[in-house]
Regions:
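Solvent-exposed loop/turn and edge beta-strand elements of beta-rich ligand-binding domains
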Residues: 1-398
Length: 398
């Protein structure tokens, strides 16, 4: 090594040296400037004698360096196509921003990145409908070839379930709508046997609204949900409750229409099982709790339920109504959560001088001795009167 120098601001170097005549010498670039590639090019020259009048000899060489070229692609994970609309940033090892840009349908080219240095590609905002990708760090190699770096974005994924109140059965036939924060309709569909799957919803808040519930169900309240910045499947569930029934009993005197209190009833299902026991108040009213209006199979309304109202104890002074009243609830619409049925029941008064008996249970003869005793006493009186009469006749005959 005769001499080592670095180019000046103009990219030039001058070597001045006393060199032996007829020697072969070489000029070689060892290190390229920042952002360029070392070619390894070597220039050779022979220092020849040019006569006693030439004191100096000069040689001129040109070394052409090529810049580094890095191609940065932002693509769809599934299709591999360039993805426009993502905001990207490239920083150096010290965190200084080298360049910022928004992706297009073509790869982004950056030249003159320093060989041997590491850079980080960061996505500051993904394209609409995509999740933010992880940052990529790469090192620039000493080559004039295009160096490619690819950052892939996956789409957002949302799975929406429309189920019954148990959450176990998907409900078919519900009409649903999703709107964004500005009230714009993003998607509409009718629910089926499987959850509804949506891709590419931009990150942000949305509202799920049920426009119409299936037969037998009531429209659910709106749900606000947020699509998070993740490529994982995000789940949203909306549950529909069934419409319910409520029985209202109005108990009155058959003749006067006066309200009757303390009448007792059993509400039984189709199998005869007692669902509820009801007693009328001073207004002659009794109200049941919420009742199933029917049965459901695989999330669908199957058939209407049938109930029977039976009076088990009449109000004091009234005859027991032995009618078995059938009660059913007819589904109205998806905006009516409770269907009310009014059952009017009347009682006739007991005949006058008829003692009131409080409906004894089967096998209970506690009070039966009273009328029996009356009959016995009456019969005894009649017999006594007959004997006395006969005795009087005998006396008269004497």
């Amino acid at each position: 090594l005769i001499e080592l120098k670095t180019t000046d601001a103009d990219g030039k170097i001058s070597f001045i040296a006393d060199l032996p005549i007829d020697g072969t010498y070489y000029v070689k670039e060892l290190y390229a400037p920042d952002g360029f590639v070392t070619t390894g090019e070597e220039q050779e020259f022979v220092f020849e004698y040019q006569g006693d009048k030439e004191v100096e000899a000069s040689y001129e060489f040109v070394f052409e360096d090529e810049p580094t070229t890095v191609e940065l692609s932002k693509t769809d994970l599934t299709t591999g196509e360039e993805l426009p609309g993502a905001r990207l940033q490239l920083t150096d090892e010290n965190g200084a921003v080298v360049e910022e840009w928004t992706s297009t349908k073509e790869p982004h080219i950056i030249k003159e990145l320093v060989v041997g240095k590491s850079y980080t590609l960061t996505e500051n905002k993904p394209a609409d409908g995509y999740a933010t990708a992880e940052s990529i760090t790469f090192t620039v190699e000493n080559t004039a070839e295009i160096q490619k770096q690819v950052m892939e974005d996956d789409v957002t994924k949302v799975k929406i379930s429309k189920t019954d109140i148990t959450g176990d059965n998907e409900i078919e036939g519900a009409k649903l709508t999703i709107t964004d924060e500005n009230g714009n309709i993003v998607e509409t569909w009718t629910s089926g046997k499987e959850p509804h799957y949506i891709e590419k919803l931009p990150i942000g808040k949305y509202t799920l609204k049920e426009e119409q519930a299936p037969n037998g169900y009531v429209v659910a309240e709106e749900i606000t949900f947020e699509v998070a910045d993740t490529a994982e499947i995000q789940k949203v569930a909306m549950k529909d409750d069934t419409a319910k029934g409520r029985l209202i009993i109005e108990k009155t005197d058959k003749d006067t229409g006066a309200a009757l209190k303390d009448a007792e009833f059993e509400l039984r299902d189709a199998d005869g099982k007692v669902v509820e026991t009801l007693t009328t108040d001073e207004n002659g009213h009794a109200t049941s709790g919420l009742l199933a209006i029917g049965t459901y199979k695989d999330g669908k309304f199957d058939k209407a339920a049938t109930y029977y109202l039976v009076e088990t104890k009449a109000p004091e002074g009234y005859q027991l109504d032995e009618t078995k009243h059938e009660v059913t609830f007819t589904y109205v619409d998806d905006k009516t959560p409770v269907i009310e049925v009014i059952q009017k029941v009347t009682n006739e008064k007991l005949p006058e001088d008829t003692p009131f008996v409080s409906n004894p249970k089967t096998g209970d003869d506690t009070n039966l001795w009273i009328p029996a005793l009356c009959l016995i006493l009456s019969a005894g009186g009649l017999i006594g009167m007959g004997v006395a009469s006969r005795r009087k006749k005998k006396k008269g005959g004497r």
